[in-house]
């Protein structure tokens, strides 16, 4: 340091005539009093070596954090060995003596000798390890050097484990503390080497993991130990007077430099958290000794004995309360003057004002001491400059041997440099007149030396002046300088190739609700705290690199509550997530209560000078959130690849149970496996091809396990409504066994679409649109067969919904379990900065960056209640009692939408075994099963009776059991009456979805098939097509204005005008007899006429008038045996034969009909064992309504002579309403 100082200007002129030693005075007694004390005094031995070593090591470590280059590490270890085990006096002994003198406590001789001997052994071993490491780094392929290094590493690490307790001897913890901290630092650096080089010099992956876990554990333990005993030693020095404060402040400063600064860097040794070069910053402040005369035999000549203020008063005046980091910009010094004689007088520093500014913040001004003096103040400006050294002169003005002297500072030299412009350097001076026996030079570099003597101190300085306090009493005027470490830069510069740690106290301003609190000792400075929602203050950063570089955000926090943490850049939110509490309210802030978290979503800066803001929301209660620092982490290709690989490995391993790596966890969903497979597929082939292949095999195995346990058929939706080849068909009723169908795939409405995977689904998914009529819902269903189920077991249906509205989900066995789900869509998973999530061939680019969102939030809905799910995952469980393969009750899985606004996109459906039923759940399912069986027995008795009545009525319609010829007297009313009895059979179909057959479906379809046959035969016997006008005016010729209207659930022809006419040409069998039967109603005056005729003559007519009595038509009719049932069905037969459609067409709507057609035979509401469902049997001729009052049925016999007759309908006046027209062939 001496050589460096020669490069600076000489001592300022104001004190050039005065020696740093005191001049002799004529009075011998005064001369004696001014002698420097050589015996026991309060001024402890300040070892430049002790402080220098602590500063040097911390400064050097700051340059090799993260993963250093091999050359850097070898040089660093060589430096450490040279600093801690130098030639000459033992540095460890100097550490011991320095702390002993600070606390005035001698360590026992045995403890001293044991510690020093063990440290000497560690030094020898460490030096040997360091030399072997250098040899190996020069030739890593040499097997011998690798083997030697492996052996020495294991032995040296074990030596440290055994040695550390010797530096923590009971009742000797404080004097040994600096030794303990330095030894702990070496141990942690050694443990880091296992992660850096262990795999190369022979450590197995298990050994590396064990050493890493030990490093994490020891980092916590060493940190808490050092902080605890630092506080213990400091508190033991707390006194009541100024003398105790001097010792207290020296301990605080020197052990901050030698202990706490190291502790603050311990976490950054973690190469898994910091895998690249890392920039750390120390923002704590240290205070050099007060600028007052000390070490003089005469008590009053020492400033702290000259009626100085109390301990607490000095602490309040000199030590700053917690605050944001700021930088000194201007100092204005106010002076006072005292005079004893022309040869004894002094003008000295009496007070000052300071202007300082946080990074990018506003100017703050504070006043200290007395400023109401008559002497012109001296203003010194330091904007953008670091004051790296002060040379202050402590003056003592003697008033006589029996009077108290005045202590003051007449001269200070402030040495400054501009860190951004090294040529901008110099001195700023405060110099006032002084005449007295002598001055004491107080050089700040004695207490805060540069980091190295190999460069000028304006380049190698370790600290910068940040603030100045002053201890003021009537005869005491001594400033106290506050210093910050130079690692805390002025610009928050972010590099593209390093992790930049930025303490939160470097914010530009402090928002309301945020407070700065004293750091816990292991953070390297103060921290920020909030107890409510709000921001922590903006941090202005300077980006040193391309703006295309991507970064992530990490941060270190402690909290007594859960909270949402938001990060924004330039006003745009780039990250947010919910984080959990780390401690309980009232807990002490210890190392383990702070955790480091990092976001995975990268972002870019938009300008070189940018702003990062952090805030918290959604606190789970009253509590405290502490933030230590944030980290700006560059996303490099290698770093991203390694991070992605680690994340993929963790995700794949998490698929399987801990006890059996070949067994899939129950709570791992099929959707989750697909997302993990995406994660693996996106790994870089360039960086981790082998690992990628291995992980892909594991995730494929997991997918196979998922498929094996899934009881659903075709869960990937390869097809819907695909009929298996082996399914049998009931020829009699033309009814395919839906029970058999449903156990072999999906069945659904025609409007469902299967779509290929997108950015949400990896595999096929289905889209269910809305419907215009709740009686014709959109539906999808499948049956889990009884043979797939286990008795007394709970099963779970689950899947993933991209979005939905009014989606109803049912699980049906003994009863229906039901939920209605509204799941809001994700809009887009892709941020605006991503151009397109589509690959080159149009496929989804699942590797593109996307917003993070939490799909695992739960939503609880009561059974049957409609709710908005926040989770896109859904699950519904059902309990199975005893199983019966003959009954084959199974479980129906149903998805349904019955609203126009409804919709759903869903996939990855699973039906899996969850767990056996025990306890109350077992009792509950047995009760449900018994209740269901009791109802089933009652239903069977009822069904037997209803079925007998219905079958008798149906059989009466036909000639025999062949069901191919109707009885001669069978008419449409009899058919309708029989059909009504058939529909009294309950549980033919499920009320939840009437296309699914119920327990009585088979007998219902048997009889319903006969009804359909009867109607078909009856239609064939009636040669008039669309005679009931159910298909509007199809097959009829119309002249004038006519209409078909719905009345009493029937379709009626309405002729409102006399000039209108409706007619139809009908093919007949010449020579056979026919009956023309018409049911109609006449309103108003005039007559309604239905005429039948041939081309010439042979005309007959039925006339209708208002208020006529209904005629009873005869049942005995003639026959024409040679006329086939198929004759006369050509032409428009298909369009008119509306009643021949089976139930399977019930959900198809004919959009080509000429009128707004609604089927005539409406279904009445019917109470099922579950609930009413007015849509349940809306499929055919059910409850055919009787002819309303006022309608009249008339008929006549007609014998055509040709093969064509014409039927014409008209009126003379008023309105003529025709319900039906029939021309029936007479039978024998």
UniProtKB/Swiss-Prot annotation:
Keywords: Sporulation, Toxin, Virulence
InterPro entries linked: Cry1Ac-like_dom-VII (IPR048645), Cry_V (IPR041587), Galactose-bd-like_sf (IPR008979), Pest_crys (IPR038979), Pest_crys_Cry1Aa_dom-IV (IPR054544), Pest_crys_dom-III (IPR005638), Pest_crys_dom_I (IPR005639), Pest_crys_N_sf (IPR036716)
GO biological process: sporulation resulting in formation of a cellular spore; symbiont-mediated killing of host cell
Molecular-function annotations in GO: signaling receptor binding; toxin activity
Note, other: Toxic segment of the protein is located in the N-terminus.
Name of this protein: Pesticidal crystal protein Cry1Ba
Species in which this protein is naturally found: Bacillus thuringiensis subsp. kurstaki
Role noted for this protein: Promotes colloidosmotic lysis by binding to the midgut epithelial cells of insects.
Gene3D superfamilies with a match to the protein in the record: Galactose-binding domain-like, Pesticidal crystal protein, central domain, Pesticidal crystal protein, N-terminal domain
Coiled coil (UniProt feature): none
Any Pfam family matching the protein: Endotoxin_N
Record flagged with keyword Lipoprotein: no
Family: Belongs to the delta endotoxin family.
Residue span of region Disordered: 423-458
């Amino acid at each position: 340091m001496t050589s460096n100082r020669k490069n600076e200007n000489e001592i300022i002129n104001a004190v050039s005539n005065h020696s740093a030693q005191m001049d002799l005075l004529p009075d011998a007694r005064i001369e004696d009093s001014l002698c420097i004390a050589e015996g026991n005094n309060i001024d402890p031995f300040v070892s430049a070596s002790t402080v220098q070593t602590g500063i040097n090591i911390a400064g050097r470590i700051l340059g090799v954090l993260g993963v250093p280059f091999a050359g850097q590490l070898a040089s660093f270890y060589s430096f450490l060995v040279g600093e801690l085990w130098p030639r000459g006096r033992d540095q460890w002994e100097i550490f011991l003596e320095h702390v002993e003198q600070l606390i005035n406590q001698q360590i026992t001789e045995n403890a001293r000798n044991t510690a020093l001997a063990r440290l000497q052994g560690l030094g020898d071993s460490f030096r040997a390890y360091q030399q072997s490491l250098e040899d190996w780094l020069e030739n890593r392929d040499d097997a011998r050097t690798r083997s030697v290094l492996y052996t020495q590493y294991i032995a040296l690490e074990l030596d440290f484990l055994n040695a550390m307790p010797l530096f923590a001897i009971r009742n000797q913890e404080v004097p040994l503390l600096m030794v303990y901290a330095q030894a702990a630092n070496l141990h942690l650096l050694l443990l880091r080497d296992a992660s850096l080089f262990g795999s190369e010099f022979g450590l197995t992956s298990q050994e590396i993991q064990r050493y890493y876990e030990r490093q994490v554990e020891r980092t916590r333990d060493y940190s808490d130990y050092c902080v605890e005993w630092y506080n213990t030693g400091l508190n033991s020095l707390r006194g009541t007077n100024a003398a105790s404060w001097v010792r207290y402040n020296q301990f605080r400063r020197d052990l901050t430099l030698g202990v706490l600064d190291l502790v603050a860097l311990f976490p950054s040794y973690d190469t898994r958290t910091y895998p690249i070069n890392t920039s750390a910053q120390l923002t704590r402040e240290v205070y050099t000794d007060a600028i007052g005369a000390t070490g003089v035999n005469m008590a009053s000549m020492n400033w702290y004995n000259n009626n100085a203020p109390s301990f607490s008063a000095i602490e309040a005046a000199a030590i700053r309360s917690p605050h944001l980091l700021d930088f000194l910009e201007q100092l204005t010094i106010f002076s006072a003057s005292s005079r004893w004689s022309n040869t004894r007088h002094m003008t000295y520093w009496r007070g000052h004002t300071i202007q300082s500014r946080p990074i990018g913040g506003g100017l703050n001004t504070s006043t200290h001491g007395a400023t109401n003096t008559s002497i012109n103040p001296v203003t010194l400006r330091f904007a953008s400059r670091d004051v790296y050294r002060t040379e202050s002169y402590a003056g003592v003005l003697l008033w006589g041997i029996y009077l108290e002297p005045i202590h003051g500072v007449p001269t200070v030299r402030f040495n400054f440099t501009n860190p951004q412009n090294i040529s901008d350097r110099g001195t700023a001076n405060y110099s006032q007149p002084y005449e007295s026996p002598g001055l004491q030079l107080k050089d700040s570099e004695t207490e805060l030396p540069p980091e190295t003597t190999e460069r000028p101190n304006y380049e190698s300085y370790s600290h910068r002046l940040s603030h100045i306090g002053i201890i003021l009493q009537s005869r005491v005027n001594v400033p106290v300088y506050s210093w910050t470490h130079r690692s805390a830069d002025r610009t928050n510069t972010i590099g593209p190739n390093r992790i930049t740690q930025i303490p939160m106290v470097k914010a530009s301003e402090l928002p309301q609700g945020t407070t700065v609190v004293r750091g816990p000792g292991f953070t390297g400075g103060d921290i920020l705290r909030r107890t409510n929602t709000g921001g922590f203050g903006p941090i202005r950063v300077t980006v040193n690199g391309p703006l295309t570089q991507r970064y992530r955000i990490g941060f270190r926090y402690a909290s007594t509550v859960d909270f949402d943490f938001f990060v924004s850049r330039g006003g745009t939110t780039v990250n947010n997530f919910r984080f959990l509490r780390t401690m309980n309210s009232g807990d002490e802030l210890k190392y383990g209560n702070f955790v480091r978290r990092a976001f995975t979503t990268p972002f870019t800066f938009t300008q070189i000078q940018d702003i990062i803001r952090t805030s918290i929301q959604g606190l789970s209660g009253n509590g405290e959130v502490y933030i230590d620092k944030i980290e700006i982490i560059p996303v490099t290709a290698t770093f991203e690849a390694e991070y992605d690989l680690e994340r993929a490995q963790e995700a794949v391993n998490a698929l399987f149970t801990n006890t059996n790596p070949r067994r899939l966890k129950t709570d791992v969903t099929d959707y989750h496996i697909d997302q993990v497979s995406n994660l693996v597929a996106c790994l870089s082939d360039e960086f981790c091809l082998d690992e990628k292949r291995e992980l892909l095999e594991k995730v494929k195995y997991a997918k196979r396990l998922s498929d094996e346990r899934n009881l659903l058929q075709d869960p990937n939706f390869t097809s819907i409504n695909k009929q298996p080849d082996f399914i049998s068909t009931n020829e009699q009723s033309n009814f395919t066994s839906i029970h058999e169908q449903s156990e072999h795939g999906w069945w659904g409405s025609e409007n469902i679409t299967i779509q290929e995977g997108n950015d949400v689904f990896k595999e096929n998914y289905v889209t269910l649109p809305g419907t215009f009529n709740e009686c014709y819902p959109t539906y999808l269903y499948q049956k889990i067969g009884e043979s797939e189920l286990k008795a007394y077991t709970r099963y779970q249906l689950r899947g993933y919904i991209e979005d939905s509205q009014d989606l109803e989900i049912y699980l049906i066995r003994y009863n229906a379990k039901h939920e209605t789900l509204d799941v809001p869509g994700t809009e887009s998973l892709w941020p605006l900065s991503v151009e397109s999530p589509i690959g080159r061939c149009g496929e989804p680019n699942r590797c593109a960056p996307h917003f993070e969102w939490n799909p695992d939030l739960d939503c609880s809905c009561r059974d049957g209640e409609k709710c908005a799910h926040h989770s896109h995952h859904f699950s519904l469980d059902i309990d199975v009692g005893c199983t019966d393969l003959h009954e084959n009750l199974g479980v129906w899985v149903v998805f349904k939408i019955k609203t126009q606004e409804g919709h759903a996109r869903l996939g990855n459906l699973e039906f899996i075994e969850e767990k056996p039923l025990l306890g109350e759940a077992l009792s509950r399912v047995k009760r449900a099963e018994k209740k269901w069986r009791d109802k089933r027995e009652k239903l069977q008795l009822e069904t037997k009776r209803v079925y007998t009545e219905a079958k008798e009525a149906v059989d009466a319609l036909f000639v025999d059991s062949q069901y191919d010829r109707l009885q001669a007297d069978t008419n449409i009313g009899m058919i309708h009456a029989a059909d009504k009895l058939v529909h009294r059979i309950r549980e033919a179909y499920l009320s939840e979805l009437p296309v699914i057959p119920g327990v009585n479906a088979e007998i219902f379809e048997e009889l319903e098939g006969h009804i359909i046959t009867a109607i078909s035969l009856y239609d064939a016997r009636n040669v008039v097509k669309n005679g009931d006008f159910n298909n509007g005016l199809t097959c009829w010729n119309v002249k004038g204005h006519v209409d078909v209207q719905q009345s009493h659930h029937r379709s009626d022809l309405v002729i409102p005008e006399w000039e209108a006419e409706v007619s139809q040409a009908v093919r007949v069998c010449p020579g056979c007899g026919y009956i023309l039967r018409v049911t109609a109603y006449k309103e108003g005056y005039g007559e309604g006429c239905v005429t039948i005729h041939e081309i010439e003559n042979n005309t007959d007519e039925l006339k209708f008038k208002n208020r006529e009595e209904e005629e009873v038509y005869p049942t005995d009719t003639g026959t024409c045996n040679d006329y086939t049932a198929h004759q006369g069905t050509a032409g428009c037969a298909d369009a008119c034969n509306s009643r021949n459609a089976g139930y399977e067409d019930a959900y198809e709507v004919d959009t080509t009909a000429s009128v707004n057609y609604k089927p005539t035979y409406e279904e009445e509401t019917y109470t099922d064992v579950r609930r009413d469902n007015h849509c349940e049997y809306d499929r055919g001729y059910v409850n055919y309504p009787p002819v309303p009052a006022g309608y009249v049925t008339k008929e006549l016999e007609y014998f055509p002579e040709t093969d064509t007759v014409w039927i014409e309908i008209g009126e003379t006046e008023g309105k003529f309403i025709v319900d039906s027209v029939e021309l029936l062939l007479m039978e024998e």
